[in-house]
Amino acid sequence: MTQWWQWSGEAGAGRGGFAVIGVGRFGSSVCAELLRAGAEVLAVDNSQRAIDELRQIDPAIEARVVDCTDEEALRAAGVLDLETVVVAMSEPIEASITATLICKDAPGTRVKQVIARATSDLHMRMLQRVGADRVVFPSRMQGARLGRELVRPNLLERLRLDDSNGIEEITVPPSFVGRSLRDLNLRRHFQVTVLAAGQVNHLTFNPPASTVLGAGELLVVMGSWKALEALPAD
């Protein structure tokens, strides 16, 4: 803390949702977290074995065996119709670079954001050069954490208390801005307890009910995982 995704895309219409290219350990973790959050997910991989293993997580998941370096194959699968693509494969390096380039620059692509996995600083720079909007290192970020960030962009950090409960630090959602804690009554409406609120590096712990939340400020809340995930993300 700060001080603590058979595809049925509609032709001609860009869609929300996520595509995950490469479903090894990292990609599968991303898919699992997205599915758990109820997100629309399309998974593709060169390997039938990888796709079969992914279906053990959720037999209903939309997953296809696709040449991930072939523009027309990715287009036919529906990957280029989704807003966010996670290029989760890292080897061979040329494959991840090619997939990233296709998603960003292919004619008619509707992809708005590509998050690519890198294995080295050089790999990172090459991915950025072909248009990756964000590059992550598996050694520094778990797939599950990336999945959570994708569906809850205002989640900054989470602390596990036990299997059922935790503490999260989030950016104040727009729907909370300008409202007091008394008005929001998060304990009643969301079953969470507010531990702290305020500006970055200037949090007020156990804030009074009169505290009015501002744009860009932070909120630290405690509750069950189910309750925390029900908080608005935007």
Predicted features by range, described:
Residues 1-234:
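Cytosolic regulatory regions of ion transport systems
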